[in-house]
Regions:
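Helical "lid/coupling" subdomains associated with nucleotide-phosphate turnover
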Residues: 1-149
């Protein structure tokens, strides 16, 4: 986007080849838009349901391979994650595996995990009408001057 090859709607303005066999195409951009919109809309709707602002979020932990390879600044620049949270984003690797290992060897941590699971609320975003509306709104990319906000 910084190079002007992708507009704010996600349209690839010209082909982009990294090498003769590795290139970026419109389908790649669309897949990114779908993921970006889902994450951005999910954050907005969950904050709305809890009655908080994104600025109130203390930490953002990104787990798994996604977190290992995610560049936080780029995720904020494209609107996937709120820019206000940039300095609070941490990649934590294989959180599920590490949590299972800790719970397996530490009874106290196992009990804490159970208590946390019992008070965790499941939200079915895919069935939420507001989520669908925000999801569609989040498909585009911020214009260049919005990246730093």
């Amino acid at each position: 986007m910084k190079q002007g090859r992708i507009d704010e709607t996600g349209r690839l303005t010209e082909p982009y080849y990294f090498t003769s066999r590795v290139f970026l195409n419109q389908r790649d951009i669309r897949e990114l838009q779908l993921a970006k919109a889902a994450i951005a809309a999910g954050i907005q709707i969950l904050c709305q349901k809890k009655g908080i602002r994104t600025e109130d979020i203390e930490r953002v932990l990104i787990a798994g391979a996604f977190g290992n390879y995610l560049d936080s600044a780029s995720a904020c620049a494209i609107g996937m994650l709120p820019s206000a949270l940039l300095d609070r984003i941490t990649s934590i690797g294989n959180a599920a595996g590490e949590g299972a290992r800790i719970a397996a060897v530490n009874r106290e941590q196992f009990e804490r995990s159970k208590a946390l699971a019992e008070k965790t609320e499941f939200v079915e975003l895919a069935l939420d009408v507001e989520f669908q509306e925000v999801y569609v709104d989040e498909m585009g990319f911020p214009e260049e001057e919005e990246h730093g906000e």
